[in-house]
């Protein structure tokens, strides 16, 4: 047994290898690939134990993420103020456990803002799942069919990174990804090509909204800073909503009307 911390002592005296950080980064990046390869090789009782351990890890991860999300939830705290500690004119106020309650309320209001506009296309044709998705066969013998490829145009954002192959259920092809939209101003009767900031609401399904699918009637958020629009208070308007009026997958472009 070693009597001293000779490894730490050597590190303090001479430092680490010059490529230590790079090697560590690459090793960490390959861990997911190694875990995937190991999971495919093992079988029998060892595989059962491995899957049970991974399942427990994922459950714990979900609980941790949920705990982080609950910090932003507005909750009434009855024990914050004791009886008789407040003057009469403050008794109607509730104690708040979370300081982020106001910001959460603002975010929720922003989410529902798309419903307040009278849109050019109030009704659109429903799209069947067979038309929206193509089934992708996977596995060694192509017997698994849990993956789907989106047949419609999509928007994924600038910092988008695909999930690992084992976890990516919905594939959005590069050729159908859109970043700009032709936006027509209804009052000026002029058309501008503006960058898309996000998909606010797809009338077909919340799933299509989360995937960023662009179909006829979808509400987009576009960057209107080039138009020089200002609010009544004199502030510059950076983004506004627009509704798609064509079928982007057929035309190869997005035509939309600005909601003013």
Curated annotation (Swiss-Prot):
Stored Gene3D superfamilies:
2.40.10.310
Does this entry carry the keyword Ribonucleoprotein?
Answer: yes
Give a GO biological-process term: maturation of 5.8S rRNA from tricistronic rRNA transcript (SSU-rRNA, 5.8S rRNA, LSU-rRNA)
Compartmental location: Nucleus, Nucleolus
What parts of the sequence cross the membrane?
A: none
Q: One GO term of the cellular component aspect? A: preribosome, large subunit precursor
Which residue stretches does the UniProt record annotate as biased composition, category Basic and acidic residues? 17-36, 66-79
Quaternary context:
Component of the pre-66S ribosomal particle. Interacts with NOP7 and RRP1. Interacts with RSA4 (via WD repeats).
Question: Which PANTHER family did the record assign?
Answer: RIBOSOME BIOGENESIS PROTEIN NSA2 HOMOLOG (PTHR12642)
The UniProt family comment states: Belongs to the eukaryotic ribosomal protein eS8 family. Ribosome biogenesis protein NSA2 subfamily.
Protein name, UniProt field: Ribosome biogenesis protein NSA2
What species does this protein belong to?
A: Cryptococcus neoformans var. neoformans serotype D (strain JEC21 / ATCC MYA-565)
**Lineage in the entry?**
Eukaryota, Fungi, Dikarya, Basidiomycota, Agaricomycotina
